[in-house]
Every structure is written in structure tokens, then in C-alpha cells.
Amino acid sequence: MTAPRIIQNPAELDALAGGCFVPTMGALHQGHLSLIRAAARSGDPVITSIFVNPTQFAPNEDFDAYPRPVDRDIKLAGEAGSDAVYLPSESSLYPEGREASIDLAASLPIPEVAKRPQLEDAGRPHFFGGVCLVVARLLEQVRPSAAVFGEKDWQQLQVIRAMVASDARFQGIEVIPGPIVRERDGLAMSSRNASIPSMHRERACGLANALDAAESAKTPADAESVMRTTLEAHQLAMEYAVI
């Protein structure tokens, strides 16, 4: 298999305009690779980006510690069907500088689905502004015909769909959802799973167990109740469990 083309200069993306785009923060796992394979099935050139985005991390979060195995990621992306791997510099995406870009992300008008009560924005009010800013700038540079995002981050997927649909710059870009890929024990694959201590792994699986338990509930209220009960039984600190 031919190694993917490595692109660092945004101008080099012009030759791949109209392709299928898979944005990632790297530390690729089988969930990411399933998105790249889905993009490859489109028959269009596949561009995978790797960029750990500072505007979606709060000061107390793990930006500096986030894994960055870039050489490994390039190899895996190519094996999964990526024709090019885009490695943007922070300055190419945020020419205004990091602090100014963080302030800009915080001030962006974001889709209403990002502000649903009791969901991600309640605990991480910075997050979706940062996601919308980086995705918008990547889409401007890559100019794809389609982009693939995972269903694991369900609210994020809906935010991106709403942003793309409402922004004239992105008309005609198809947002393709990619199914969740799980570990053998049911935990959704995530780049952060490697940081879960082995003694806490069973507790972490309470997330999947809570969703499984909710599936058989007769009403949304019953589903939320059984999710909370299951999460508490696994000794998990619950931020939200909402249908």
C-alpha cells in the first residue's frame, strides 16, 4: 500500500479539494480507522487531519498530556485508506495566536443543540465553541465534498451538522456519521482509554452498561432513572444522564 501524502502547507490541499475529510486529534484507534474506511468507500480522495486543538481544552484539562504518536498515526491512516494526512500548524489555523483564538471560540455564536440543558455545555462551556472554530477553519482549508464524524460524540455530531447546514461557506458539504466502535468489554474506543487505570476499567464500563440498561426502559424518564442507578452502582461521578 502506498504511504499517504503528508501535507503541512495548506496550499497543497488545493489538489485534493472535493475529497472526503476525516478530522482527528490523532492517537488513532479502530474507531478513527473505521471513519477513514468509511471515507474511502466514497471513492473520493481521503484526507485525514491530525491536530490537537487548544481552543476546545479548558486550562485544567489534558491538552499538554494528550497523546501525540504522529508517525504511528500516519502509518495507520494510510493503511486504513487515507490518501493524504494533513498536519496543520497551530499558526496556520489560528494566525491570531492561541489566546486570541481561545477568546474568539468563547465568543462564537454556536448552534442551539450545543446549549441543551444538562448536556456537555453545562460542564464544559468552552468546548463547542472551540470545536466549531477548528472544524470551520479546517473545512475552509480542505474544501471537501464530505466529512466523516463519529457517533460516539453524539452531541458534537449534531452541533457540526447544524453548523455546516447554517453556514453559507459550507453548503454542499455532506456530514457522514460513523458508528461507535467498542472495546471487547463494551467501552467505546477513545484515545483517552489508555489513561484509565486497570483497577478502574470495570467502573468505566458502567457507561456502556447504563446505555444498555436504558434501552429496555418504557419511557425517557425511566431510561434516565436506570442510567443514573447504573452509573451510581459503578461508582462513577455523574455529570449528566439525559435522553
Language model regions located:
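Nucleotidyltransferase catalytic core that binds NTPs
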Residues: 2-237
